[in-house]
Amino acid sequence: TDIKKAEAALIRRFQEEVSRFWDMEITSLSPIDTLSENMDIPLWNRLLKCLKNIAAERYDGILILHGTDTLAYTANLLSLLFAGTSIPILLISSNYPLEDRRANGYANFKGAVEAVGRGLPPNIYVCYRNRDGKTYLHLGSRLTQCPPGSDEFFSAGLPCFGEVSSSRLRLYQR
């Protein structure tokens, strides 16, 4: 399936690169395989059930591959239902298919893994690289939908929570 191919490509590329966290153990689950524009209540419930069944104490963080069309909705939903999570839960997406050279999906995946590896505090986040080349961490509860005609994400009412790169995790808010 497309989601399995994307997962494999992201993990393979990350492990091939030089990263302090290249050997991080990654467990993959695929409770949903649909375009995010097709998300509905039964699919969100399937995702929620999967997340509730994960033994959080076994993991440093959870990464959720998600489409951009309903990314802000899912991030806000998870922020409400998983408030008080004991580990960081990050949603990542790509503005284009991963094969497209303009795609930011790998940067978003890498940023999320780097953030978890560098001790990102528990919460719900979206890790997303905008056109300025910076990979931002947004609180899931603050993420807004992309402005019309744009593929960039922003935080409502506040600057983003932080920024992540291969060399550091910079948190603007605590």
PLM feature spans:
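Active-site histidine-anchored catalytic micro-motif
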Residues: T1-R174
